Structure formats: structure tokens, C-alpha cells
Amino acid sequence: MTGLGALRKLRENNLNVHCFIDSDAAFNEKKSYGYKVFNPNKLKKIINTSNDFAILVAVALKEDEIKNQLRELKIDNSVLVHSFHDENAPYYTVDILSSCNLKCASCPHSIEDSDVPKGSMTLGTFKEVFDKIIKDSPSVSHISLYSWGEPLLHPYLDEIINYVHDKNVAVALSSNLSINFDKRLEKIIKAKPDYLKISLSGFYPDAYNNTHQGGDIRLVKSNLYLLRYLLDKNNVNTLVDINYHLYKDNSFENIRKMEDLADELGFIVSKTYALVMPLERVIAHQDGKPDFQTQQLEKNLLVTIDEGIQASSEMKLPVNTCPFRENQININADLSVPICCTVWQRDTNVVASNFLNSSIVEINEAKKNVKLCEKCMDLNLPEYNMGFNKSGWDEYASQKQHSDKGCIANDGSNKISRK
């Protein structure tokens, strides 16, 4: 998504773009907005074709990881490497609607008796928020209109997107797509969102319903076809990324069928190991006080909380460093600002009660006083939530028995493949 924001700014300044580089295998050799996406291993070959190339690192959250990879590829000294990161233009997420129509087990919306307020941001309030973002961060290139909520339920989403685009800022959306849209989806598509992530966890109802509680995968698939139709009808190039959450019960035939559907529709399928959210639940687990829901969910995880932390800790961040805290500002629908996007409870985790009345400096200073951060970093949870050291996660997943009906490995072992 950050690359699409950078693309807008580069085009605005008449700078030529050759390609995108992304380590996610889902994007390899695909096209985004007319530009081919290559694996980092192709960088040397690309650079050797011209002396005019420069590398623009667009993802602030993973900038250190990317620069380390460039050093490992031994090309960091052979080409100019620029950072797109601007301390005065953090990654903004605005949760325009704080409620959701589903109650997925891995998400805090499934937590009963939560005191977190539900509601939506009015169109007028959003305009005030975005105007302040532009004033505080003139170089901002992209914004996400979601955090914990379902933005496609917002009645004025199309107008919100148009308002953001008027300032040449890219828009990212995320949806479960299990929604009866009527004619609203076409209004959203006509607004040309730059990126749309579809979160799901199965192709067949038995798998999907187990982890996306309250959703209907048949409705989701119907909407995927509708989405393709509307994109073509309106000549819109929105990058559609089907973000597939991997569990024990959906990682063979389910994922293969979803990949076939995505190929048919021209969408991307990016796979991610399911995590337990929010941060408070993971810390409770680490303290030896897991709630019943987390205990039940872990039975279906390909990589347990402890395993994920162990794998991610092999690539530790510098001491007292967290990319979520330092590179993001998250704004809730009620205008409160939490310490980061991984927390749920409001209490001491809110660093500003009203974004409109707080400066970036004040927000960042308040973040330094949140005690939860110290414990989170001591437990290596920023690395866990970033999914560092994917090969380590793959290793743990490959040792697990799966329950995806009808799918047995070729050797009959019914263990998870590393593919």
C-alpha cells in the first residue's frame, strides 16, 4: 500500500517508475497499476540494465528489514537508496467505523462485554481529521481507512475516498466482504480506492465459518465476482488483495480453490499465519492467564503464540524500538488516539483523547509514557506482530497436523506443506 502512495507522489513530480519490488510471493511477476512486481532477488539483474536506477524504500514499518536485505544482496553500494519515510508524515490509519458485522475468534470484536465504544465518524468530522493530517503532514502519501472496523459499511465511504484523492493521497481499505451491498459497492468502486484487502479464511463454509464467525463465504465469493465486474465496467485499477488467514483447517484444498478463484478474477492472494489479537490477549497469555477463547483458538493455529514469538525473536529490533509506536498514528472513530494499532482497551493506552486538539509532537511525547510498551518490547511482541523471520514460522507450520478435509500430503503424512 505504501508503494502505491509513493507512486502517486512520483507521478505528481514527473519521475519515472520502472517496477515494484516486493518479497511477498503473492505479488511475484504480477502487475500493479501497470508496473510489474519483482522479487528482491531480481534486483541485481534489473539494476545492471541501466545506470539511472534508484531504489525508493516506501515501507517505513519495514525499512530496516529492507535495508538489511539490500546489504545481503550486496547492492546497497551500487545504486542510490532513498527512504520515503518522513518523520512528519507517519502512517495514518483512520477507523472511520469502529464496529464490525462479524465476530472472528482472532479479533477483539469477538470479546464479550467490551467497553470499547462503537460508532462511526461523520463525513464532516472525517474532513476535519483529514484536513488536519494534511496540515500536520503535507508530504503524506497514503492513508488507511480502517483499523478494527468494517469500513465498507460506512454510508459515505465513496465521498470520503474522493475527499482524500482530491489531495492526491492514496486510500487503502480492508473488508470481510460478507456484506449485502445492494448498489453501494459500485459507488465505492467508482471512487477508485487504490488498495482493497479482502480478509478471509477458507473457500468452503465449514472452514470459513469456524474462524470468520457470522460471515457467509458464499456471499463473499459472490461479491468477489461482483467486484471484478464493477472494476471492469468502470475501468478501475484498484489492487485487490485476498488476504488469506492460514489455520490448520483451511490450508490445503481450501487455499488451492481460493487461489484458483483469484487467478480467474485477476486478484492477488497473500497468505498470512493467523495471529491472536489484540495485544492485551497475547500479553495475558504470556502472563499465564489466557482467556478461554484464546485457548480454543490456539488449537487451530498453525503457529502458536509461543512459536510465533520464538520465530520472530530470531530477528530482534534494536532495543527500545517499535515500528508501530514510531511510524504510525491511529485515529479511532471517536477521535481518540491509541498508542498503536495492536491495542484494544482504551484506559491507559490512549495517548490523545481528541486528535483534532493534539499535535504530532504531543502525541509522540505521550507515547513515550505508556507503560505497556516496555512490557510489549520485552516480550518481543512488535516482532511477533510484524511476522519477522517467516521461514521460522514456516518451519513450525510444517510440523503440524492439518484437518482440511480431503487433503492429504503425497506421503500420506497429513502434515502442513511449506509451500
Pin down the residues of each PLM region.
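Short, small/polar residue-rich loop motifs at catalytic or cofactor-binding pockets
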Residues: C322-R325
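Phosphate-bearing ligand-interacting subdomains
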Residues: F27-D86
